[in-house]
Amino acid sequence: MNSLSLSGKSWFLKKYNQEDVTFIKDNYSLDEITSKLLSIRKIKKEDINSFLNPVVKNFIPNPNTLIDMEKSSLRTYEAIMSNEKIGIFGDYDVDGASSTALLGNYLHELNLDFNIYIPDRKKEGYGPSIKSFKEFLDKKIKLIFTVDCGTLSFEAIDFAKKNNIDVIVLDHHQSEIKLPDAFSIINPNRFDDKSNLQNLCAAGVTFMFLVSLNRELRVKKWFQDNNINEPDLINYLDLVSLGTVCDVVPLTGLNRAFVKQGLKIIKLKKNLGIKTLLDICKIETNPTIYHLGFMLGPRINAGGRVGKCSHGANLLLNKDPKKSYSLASELDQFNEERKILESNLLQKILNETKTNVDDPVLILSGKNWHEGVIGIVAARLKDKLNKPVILISLENDIGKASARSITGFDIGSVIISATQENILIKGGGHKMAGGFSIKIENIDKFKNFAIRRFKNINEDISKEKPIFLDDVISPSAINLEFFNKVALLSPFGPGNPEPKFAIENLKTINGKIVAKKHIKSTLLGKDGSIIKTIAFNSVNKDLGEYLLKKNNKLFNIAGKLSLNEWRGQSNVEFIIDDISVNKNFKNTVPSSIG
């Protein structure tokens, strides 16, 4: 289907192999749509069962495939045997909070004491500092774990080593060829790691470490000798799935298994902090990726963005219901403050940005922009403009930046290279996001550096992307049975995108604005079927205007299915991404994704 739409995008039907579809239907007892979706995703026949039923034990490799894993487990065992004090330094985002809680809750289950340190974003910035490690030193801590950070923390780790403190880094951010002089660095994205686990977030890396440590303690008969029940690590997958979803890593292989099983653990509400957040958010249905990514995650992140940076980790570690409710309530309030700050800054930038809009990498700066929200505003602009965006908050003669990128442009690599060339003071990140500090006098130099790197990419990765559709369905297919067939391929996310469908020849019965920015509408199909739809953030846009006006013209919609659960009732609605009034469809797809 090739159709120019209200958004100016072309629609294309994805290709599938009919022989494969027939084989899958006949041999796996699956229906037409599920078989077609598996064919489109090019799932190998021998992998179909594991894809539809991803289980961690079937995907997880020997943790020792990660460099430094074995020595880290042995060092931690020695610390436990010697009653050494343990410190955990975590990042202030969801992945950092989840990783801190994973390690902390495990140590708690072993009846071991530990101290955590979450830096203040505004005062201390990202990653360990000499100041933070001095606090550990004053508490006579001899073993420090850094989680979701540490790979580029040369000064702090040198300070620790000089003071006879061992540092174990559990991270996933890209490294330089030179590594800090830590006791060990477990990071699938360190330059010399060959584990093929580069898509793990920090929570995934931390879980791998716990698997290794748990095995070490079992082999050494520590549980038996100390009359302590061995922890069931499956119960920790709620935290792993939370970090995995909120850090937006690819949901393929092991990550997909983490999330699939993790959602089941979240449903059991074993973690008091997660349970309290679910209650605060009034989530009464089975938790989904949406709930993690758009409801729980933003609240945990809000502490690090505009409130108290340690609240997220403390909530996920907490065992007291009253304290848990207090922390979750504060995070909920911080999130409301974050929304206002974000909206104001986004509007300010959109109003003032008249230059640089044609640059392939948009780099903007402003005095005293709130450091806690520039990252999320950069993400909004990146989605709107479909290009990498870097926002720099200026204070005195230093700028602090947050970057968000698009597929095909490795922003973490760009930041590390610019740091090595002394354009930046310090910085780091991964393929899709990063951060750095810079002298104001070097901003133009960095801008030229980033744009030059972008232009070295052969393909035009920033051009407007078409909408790729998995199938054209009838209005009568919008029901619970069809939704459940599609949901067999979940969880959906990067690497396993949610299926998109087109529905042809519809009329609007009615439409209304909800929450001041969305359009709910009721549509009528040629077959007489009535479907409920919603178009998010469509007010004052062509899409929204079309749905609100009365006309008898037939039109087509593209989007995805959504399950609405309310008071025990389940209804399927269609989320509209785009509208086309063109009837000239053809079953073609660009050869690039054939």
Regions found by a protein language model. Give the residues of each.
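Short alpha-helices
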Residues: 102, 181-224, 237-245
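Hydrophobic helix-and-loop "lid/oligomerization" segment in the mid-to-C-terminal part
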Residues: 6, 14-143, 163-164, 215-445, ...
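Intrinsically disordered, low-complexity regulatory tails of plant transcription factors
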Residues: 153-154, 247
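Mid-to-C-terminal polyanion-binding domains and interfaces
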Residues: 4, 74, 78-85, 323-329, ...
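Acidic-glycine-rich active-site phosphate/pyrophosphate-binding loop
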Residues: 78, 177-187, 524-528
